[in-house]
């Protein structure tokens, strides 16, 4: 069976969708997937994933969530900034979606797959939704988008139509 280029996992808030798609992303990038589909946790790819620096993985989420653990956090300089005058955004901004363009235009490193995790999908504002839609309409080869949402009614119908949907 061929993997869809975009999968949207949806269900009530707090059931673990973000953790699930992070684990799914790791298993897609793992070099020695276990018989149960889980990532091995020991290969070079899993090592990079756990250290939040896998070259074929990107996570997109609002700035307001970046202090929470769950994947590719930007550790280092960003954590040492003094209190900013601007509150972290609760939206996924167009700049974040545009930043994926460079990532998607370079060749992949290990398995040939490139994985983008995006949550919560309803945090996409209108400009970022439209930018993502362009990518979903013409997905780069070997790229898989894993999205999570608490409410399908808050997403553009055109984005919904481009994703395989799984209720959780």
Where are these regions (language model features)?
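Clamp-loader machinery-focused feature within the broader ASCE/P-loop NTPase space
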Residues: 1-127
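Helical "lid/switch" subdomain of P-loop NTPase nucleotide-binding domains
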Residues: 96, 116, 120, 124, ...
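Conserved adenine-binding aromatic site and its adjacent loop/helix in ATP-hydrolyzing domains
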Residues: 102, 134, 161
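Conserved catalytic/switch belt of AAA+ P-loop NTPases
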Residues: 105, 130-147
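Small/polar loops that bind or transfer phosphate-bearing groups
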Residues: 120, 147-148, 167-168
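A short helix-turn-beta junction within AAA+ P-loop NTPase domains corresponding to the substrate/partner-engaging
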Residues: 158-168
């Amino acid at each position: 069976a061929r993997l869809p280029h975009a999968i949207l996992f949806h269900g009530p808030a707090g059931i673990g969708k973000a953790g699930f798609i992070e684990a799914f992303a790791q298993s897609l990038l793992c070099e020695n997937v276990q018989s149960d589909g889980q990532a091995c946790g020991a290969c070079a790819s899993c090592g990079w994933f756990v250290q939040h620096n896998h070259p074929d993985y990107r996570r997109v989420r609002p700035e307001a969530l970046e202090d929470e653990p769950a994947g590719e956090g930007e550790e280092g300089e960003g954590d040492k900034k003094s209190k900013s005058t601007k509150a972290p955004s609760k939206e996924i901004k167009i700049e974040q979606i545009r930043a994926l363009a460079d990532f998607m235009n370079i060749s992949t490193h290990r398995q040939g797959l490139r994985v983008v995790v995006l949550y919560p999908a309803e945090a996409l504002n209108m400009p970022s939704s439209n930018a993502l839609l362009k990518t979903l309409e013409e997905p780069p080869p070997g790229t898989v988008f894993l999205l999570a949402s608490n409410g399908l009614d808050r997403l553009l119908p055109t984005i919904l139509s481009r994703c395989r949907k799984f209720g959780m």
